Amino acid sequence: MTDVCHGYLIGKGLLRWGRQILTEVTVGIETAPRAMSIEARTIRKLRIRILPFVFLLFVVALLDRTNIGFAALTMNKELAITSRQFGLIFGIFFFGYFLFEIPSNLLLHKIGARIWIARILITWGAVAALTGFVHTVHQLYVVRFLLGLAEAGYFPGILLYLTYWFPQREQARAFALLVTANPVTTILGAPVSGLILDHVHWLGVSSWRWLLILEGAPAVIGGVLTYFLLPSRPQEAKFLTADEKEWIRAELGREEQHKLEQRRYSTLKALASGRVWHLVLIYFGMMISLYALTSWGPQLVKSLSGPYTNSMVGLLLAIPNLMALTVMIFVSRSSDRMLERRYHVAIPAIMAGTALVLLGTTRSPFYSVALLSFLAVGIYSFLGPFWALPSEFLTGFSAAAGIALINSVGNLGGFAGPYTIGAIATRTGNIYAALAITGVLSFISATLVLLLPRKARAPKG
């Protein structure tokens, strides 16, 4: 009964906080005054018509990355999965993701976002549902690898897609709204996943299987909606007037010309660019931290919270992500307003590293959730300003290739982090030493960010 009361109080607080955040997110999307410049009118329409749709699609995308962490609470025992094996199960997804990432993004740029994003959603939704039918660890390895192949290109594809619509000075905020899907997915998905694990045993089938099957369906639905609703380019958007389409074309054209005047990047030059690989290294270190949180977070909280149910674990994990959602919106707005990226990327990385190092110093559920909150704030606040960096010097096919390279190679941290933590946990019996090591990597990422060259402000046109 106490657990139910705790859950009710936490849930009530999360809802109240969520309403406040929703108000903050929608600032700037309110009813426009009668007299509004074409720029303000166009950006407002894009924020209303493009961002919410791609945001919801990305929430769907992230369910398969968070639900495996929750499924592990009961799946690992049923399939006799060790910590090392679970790290490999989580991480092997990123090998498939890595192999097809760059070709997928180039195909999106060539074929069009509507068709290609719909294809990605439908295929990965089907494969995600298949995960619930595995019976051995090796079958799980295969399906997770196939899931990575199916999903490859989705996140960098959406980032590339947003660069077709938003000028550079608006991109950090647009990217940040997209990556708020990370904490929002956990805020919504963690309690739901916990409830499914505790209560859904239909037809005598294990609850973790239903969790994986049910959370694959939204991707298929999202793929169908994408095919019919998502315009590939501004010229196809029925909600824009002719002068608004022309404003976007002219504004993005000016920015592209400015980049070309500074330096021309072909696709191959982008893939070989030292500046692109500099961003790859930064992202790799931070992805180790991100997937340490998403893969091991449920098991870490469960081990500290004793008799709490899976539903309660889900509610506790929602707290760090709700705090992160609040702060990352502020950080991205500050980055766009100041047109500054380096410190808006480096400081959150330092916060994440500090939290990871300190996690091993306490066994208190309260302080652990507080440190996980600090970690989530650091990781997610990093993402919006970071993803505004590649578009400062890449355009067209070079942007498609460069963004995909950064995301695909950087996301191999999603393999390295969970697998290393699992291997150390299997050998030592705890994960805290491994978490401290990942914290050091976040500090290295922060240092690399500060070594990036300063950029002249983009022209406003």
What is the predicted role of each segment?
Residues 49-83, 293-298:
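Extracytoplasmic
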Residues 69, 274-325:
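Extracytoplasmic gate region of multi-pass secondary transporters
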Residues 341-386:
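C-terminal transmembrane helical hairpin of 12-TM major facilitator-type secondary transporters
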Residues 100-135:
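Conserved MFS/SLC helix-loop-helix module at the cytosolic interface between two early adjacent transmembrane helices
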Residues 176-193, 219, 409-416:
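Glycine-rich segments within core transmembrane alpha-helices of 12-TM secondary carriers
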Residues 110-121, 336-349:
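Cytoplasmic membrane-interface "Motif A"-like loop-to-helix N-cap segments
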Residues 80, 112, 133-138, 339, ...:
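Helix-breaking motifs and short loop linkers at transmembrane-helix boundaries and internal kinks
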Residues 146-180:
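Cytoplasmic helix-loop-helix junction between adjacent transmembrane helices
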